[in-house]
Regions:
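Compositionally biased terminal segments of proteins
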Residues: 1-204
């Protein structure tokens, strides 16, 4: 079961492939999660670029600056591309750190999983009980469900960038839920994953 309508996610995926041919970027957000998990697809496209690539993006799209959210935005019909830049955007972890921490995955440069998890937890703590927050929460579950290799890295990131409150928020929300069928977790499977996540993250 998808979180967004298939027509929207298909358009978004096709636009992401076109974008990948035009500029260099590091993929974050829902589509990065999808490439790791093959779980829920995304509607919006979230990328990190340097200022040189931002100039190239402006040649291909109409780009606007969102001063309030510290990002740039490009749009193609109903598909939005959110663009984050070093020394400007504020997303919990410095973008200049993130832009140098990617792997190659299915033809894309994708943020490393441990950083993606931490980034998702940070964003979830802001969006909370909204539809986008719900999607963030499900994405985090999917990432843990596919096994996290570098748990030490996650704990280090949490401490280095003072994300303790955001992790507590996530764990409290995790404790409230009893299932997440959108990502294939019935009550028994959810309880087991919750126990695993708590074992990895609590008091570390």
């Amino acid at each position: 079961m998808g979180f967004y309508h298939d027509l929207i996610t298909k358009k978004s995926w096709e636009e992401l492939k076109i974008l990948n041919k035009k500029i260099k970027f590091v993929l974050i957000g829902g589509w990065a999660t999808y490439l790791y998990t093959r779980g829920l697809k995304s509607k919006d496209i979230d990328i990190i670029v340097d200022y040189g690539q931002l100039s190239k993006l402006k040649e291909a799209y109409e780009v606007t600056k969102n001063e309030r959210l510290k990002k740039y935005e490009a749009r193609k019909e109903e598909i939005q591309i959110d663009v984050y830049l070093p020394h400007y955007s504020e997303i919990g972890i410095p973008v200049d750190i993130l832009i140098g921490s990617s792997i190659s995955l299915e033809g894309f440069r994708v943020l490393k999983k441990e950083l993606l998890i931490c980034l998702k937890i940070y964003v979830f703590s802001i969006r909370g009980r909204t539809p986008k927050g719900e999607k963030d929460f499900l994405d985090i579950l999917s990432l843990f469900k596919t096994k996290v290799g570098n748990i030490t890295g996650i704990i280090k990131i949490k401490k280095d960038y003072n994300l303790e409150k955001q992790f507590v928020y996530f764990l409290n929300f995790l404790d409230e839920r009893v299932e997440a069928r959108e990502v294939g977790l019935n009550r028994h499977q959810y309880k087991r994953l919750k126990t695993e996540i708590n074992g990895l993250l609590v008091q570390r």
